[in-house]
Amino acid sequence: MKKKRYFGTDGIRGKVGDNPITPEFILKLGWAAGKVLARHGSNKIIIGKDTRISGYMLESVLHAGLASAGLSAVFTGPIPTPAIAYLTKTLRAEAGIVISASHNPFYDNGIKFFSIEGTKIPDAIEQAIEAELGKKLICVASAKLGRISRIDDAAKRYIAFCKGTFSESISLNGLKVVVDCANGATYQIAPNILRELGAKVVAIGCQPDGMNINKDCGTTDIRKLQHRVLAENANIGIAYDGDGDRMIMVDHLGYKVDGDQIIYIIARDKMQQGKLVGGVVGTLMSNMGLELSLKRLGIPFIRTSVGDRYVLNKMQETGWRIGAENSGHVILLDHNTTGDGIIAGLQVLSAMVNNSMTLHNLCRDIQLFPQKLINICLTSKYNPLISTTVIHACKVAEQELAKHGRILIRKSGTENIIRVMVEGKDENQVTDLANYIADAVKASS
């Protein structure tokens, strides 16, 4: 398969103003996507975005490109990414587009596409779009230009959908929940859903100004959430990322609960209810503790490449209904076709109520191995992963771990960084080896 030039593991992403996230490129991208999607019978595209200031500009030029190819666009305004997956299906649109850079800073943005089934578009469609990008933009005749419309009740539709995944027989009455919406797409929706289900909600990170998305808040920085949970004597804290497709939790003692622990809680609860189909899909980054804890329950576990699209592909291949990344992307195919932070949070809250247990106690049966993750920003186009220095450092680290741990070093599919992950039984050893490899990467980049 031909290597893609622009599309990464989660669409196209970059710094606004730098290629490819420029008005000129996004206009051409809209036209190219329109040409490809039109060949598949498309005539209506749903477009959503998060709260970045650049979203308004990119939304306009993206629509102009689509319209020039003869496709009409339906705008939702700021809304979580999983809402677009849901709306694309329910409104019978031929595709959905989200303008977002997920957990990245405000100065980044991106474009990702959803198919008519509400899943990420396949590689073949992305390659077809890239092929059109190399051609001259030719506008359709005036009578065939695409139009624009808006969905005024998009948020209400998604709120009703999320609430519908929560059993009517239980309530969140008596639970105090602190939510950190990262000044992003969930800032109105998540607090309202929790309140309507009976919880007492304390909301932070809900004052987006276009430039504070993910800034010292949300899944990338849970310190404020931890502090507020303790200060409010809350039962639980929930942090979303900028576009709402991932979620991290904090228990009543202020301890972080990551994606591995979250998926363990959900899988065990489904098993206890007799609703678990197959097993759980994780990634190469999933903690060994998750695998061993699921094994003790008799729940199968398999790993796939890092990226929620690969998790979903493996779920569809096996017929399993639960998959997740430890970063907090949780896919529950019984409810939605992509990672959905709000729905994943509701499933954990449901487990708390069903078992009459705190989040802290629900995590007691999963013992995570010490894991150290270091991100190294690349300053050149040279790939340090082929460096003999880095290769040697990895071999030394593997010998030190002596088959009692794992090393994973890879280039991010969404950012220009190298991720170094070391996992083992001894926390000090894990930290030392991760720093050792990271230093080798820095010296080689």
UniProtKB/Swiss-Prot annotation:
The record's Gene Ontology biological-process terms are:
carbohydrate metabolic process; peptidoglycan biosynthetic process; UDP-N-acetylglucosamine biosynthetic process
User: Can you state which reaction this protein catalyses?
Assistant: alpha-D-glucosamine 1-phosphate = D-glucosamine 6-phosphate
Which residues constitute the catalytic centre? S102 (phosphoserine intermediate)
Any idea which residues bear Phosphoserine here?
Answer: S102
Query: What InterPro entries would the database entry show?
Result: A-D-PHexomutase_a/b/a-I, A-D-PHexomutase_a/b/a-I/II/III, A-D-PHexomutase_a/b/a-II, A-D-PHexomutase_a/b/a-III, A-D-PHexomutase_C, A-D-PHexomutase_C_sf, A-D-PHexomutase_CS, Alpha-D-phosphohexomutase_SF
**Might you give the EC number(s) for this enzyme?**
5.4.2.10
Q: Which Gene3D superfamilies match?
A: Alpha-D-Glucose-1,6-Bisphosphate, subunit A, domain 3, Alpha-D-phosphohexomutase, C-terminal domain
Q: How is the cofactor bound?
A: Binds 1 Mg(2+) ion per subunit.
Name the Gene Ontology molecular function terms of this record: magnesium ion binding; phosphoglucosamine mutase activity; phosphomannomutase activity
Q: How is it modified after translation?
A: Activated by phosphorylation.
What the entry lists under HAMAP family is as follows: GlmM_B
Name this polypeptide is given: Phosphoglucosamine mutase
What organism, scientifically named, is this protein from?
A: Baumannia cicadellinicola subsp. Homalodisca coagulata
- What taxonomic ancestry is recorded? Bacteria, Pseudomonadati, Pseudomonadota, Gammaproteobacteria, Candidatus Palibaumannia
